[in-house]
Amino acid sequence: NQFLKTDGSGALSFATAGATLNNSDLVDGTTTVATSATTVMNTFAIDTVRSAKYFISITDATNSRFEVVEANVTHDGSDAYISVFGSTTDHTGPLTTFTADVSGGNVRILVTNTSSDSTVFKFQRISMDV
């Protein structure tokens, strides 16, 4: 990735971003869920990713409810394991329940909302390679 930089006297030049990730990846995304049925929020391939850390912002705009959580996910090739923690919300309880499984060669992060109103999940995922 390149960006413009200045030398302080007004001269511009291109430079290369200083971060190179060799054993991990940084991904972000958005998923909207308008049901209380269990739904896939995100997936990653079991043959390339061993574990991931998610930072997730959850918005139920219909009811003006907001929550932010962290989740750690790992797998052994057959089963997936998830730990959700650090929930901060303006509501009396969590807006969703998180689970994880392995299906079709992917780890799936699953959400089950407490309401069927449209809920937006914005996330950042840091994943570690196998």
Residue ranges and their predicted role:
Residues 1-20, 44-52, 58-67, 74-79, ...:
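Extracellular repetitive beta-rich solenoid segments
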Residues 23-26:
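Intrinsically disordered, low-complexity linker/tail regions enriched in Pro/Ser/Thr
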Residues 28-45:
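Charged, amphipathic alpha-helical segments
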Residues 28-31, 83-88, 120-121, 125-129:
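Cysteine-centric segments in proteins
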Residues 40-41, 70-73, 82, 98, ...:
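Generic hydrophobic, helix-prone segments enriched in Leu/Val/Ile
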